[in-house]
Amino acid sequence: MSLNVPSRRLLKSAPSSANALVPALQSLSINTRSIHTTPSQQWSLFGWGKQKVEERNKVKEELKQSELARTRKPTQEEIFERVRGRLEGDSIFADTTPSSQLAAEQDKHKDWATASAEKKLAAAHAKDQTPTGISLKKDHLVRVVDPDPRSRVRWERKMVIRKLQRGTDPWSVEPKAERIARTERKLVYKTGYLPTSVKKLVHLSRQIRGKTVSEALVQMQFSKKKMAKEVKTELLRAEAKAIVTRGMGLGKAAAAAAQKETGAEPVKIQTKDGKHLEIRDPTRIYVAETFVNKGFTRGVELDYRARGRVFKMNKPTTTMTVVLKEEKTRIREHQERVAKKLRQGPWVHLPDRPVTSQRQFYSW
């Protein structure tokens, strides 16, 4: 049989000597109760996550010191020391390579580059080369200017044989086309794509046809058409190309000197359109032919109409081709027309022709 009695009741019923132990027991009970009221950070599962108080205090102290060092303003002596340390060395490579050694290496490199450039220039002047070392000899450039030399040699041999045969044959006559190509000059120039239509550009094309280049330029200068300025620019380009590449229009001074010495009158001709001209310079350039061609469509514009209909309007481009010739050609054509007219003889009202289509009855 057991007896359950509270400890406080036993202590109160104990003698005075036992009463002296009550405060100690109370403090013991308080301390034992404080075990359950400690922070949860001091406790962990199976000993994981335990930190000693000293380590935590050490970490806190380090963080506090770093924060103070970051927020503290530098003193004037520290600022001077930083600036002086930056300006002491010659360069960022002062520890590894002295400045004198770097300067010597740079001078050496400059001398080598200068000598190499002078050597290349001397070799170019001496051996017909460009400064980059490209040879300018004909043998080296044969594949550029003469891609198929064997075919060229065969064609030249064929042309020489043909010329000798025709020159030694008393019955051979030079073809008319070859004679014209040998004695007269011509240039065919095609403009770029102009932002206009064929119907609009054809009027300017007809306006300059048959006129000299100077007259055509004047017509385009005072024309109200939008494309007149473009046509004028293209005419100037065509004239410059004819002078440079074909040697056209360079006999004005020679013709004037010859007329002054001999006192010859200017040549009077009549064009196929019936216009009479006086030609003082046979090398003067004129516009022999002009024609226009349709180009690509440069854009599309929508035309909105009634009842929800939409029409597509194309924006066209057009090119114009100009054929430039010298006045020698017009003189020859005039002479050919006059000779043909003389060969035909006078017109006969009732020529003597044989009777044809005879029948047994009258056909009138």
From Swiss-Prot:
Query: Which is an annotated Pfam family here?
Result: Ribosomal_L22
Q: Which GO terms describe its cellular component?
A: large ribosomal subunit; mitochondrion
The listed locations are:
Mitochondrion
According to its UniProt entry, the protein's GO biological process terms are: translation
Mitochondrion in keyword set: yes
Q: Which Gene3D superfamilies match?
A: Ribosomal protein L22/L17 (3.90.470.10)
Q: Which UniProt keywords apply?
A: Mitochondrion, Ribonucleoprotein, Ribosomal protein
| Gene Ontology terms for molecular function | structural constituent of ribosome
Entry similarity comment:
Belongs to the universal ribosomal protein uL22 family.
Q: How does it assemble?
A: Component of the mitochondrial large ribosomal subunit (mt-LSU). Mature N.crassa 74S mitochondrial ribosomes consist of a small (37S) and a large (54S) subunit. The 37S small subunit contains a 16S ribosomal RNA (16S mt-rRNA) and 32 different proteins. The 54S large subunit contains a 23S rRNA (23S mt-rRNA) and 42 different proteins. uL22m forms the wall of the exit tunnel.
Q: What does this protein do?
A: Component of the mitochondrial ribosome (mitoribosome), a dedicated translation machinery responsible for the synthesis of mitochondrial genome-encoded proteins, including at least some of the essential transmembrane subunits of the mitochondrial respiratory chain. The mitoribosomes are attached to the mitochondrial inner membrane and translation products are cotranslationally integrated into the membrane.
Q: What is this protein called?
A: Large ribosomal subunit protein uL22m
Which species does this protein come from? Neurospora crassa (strain ATCC 24698 / 74-OR23-1A / CBS 708.71 / DSM 1257 / FGSC 987)
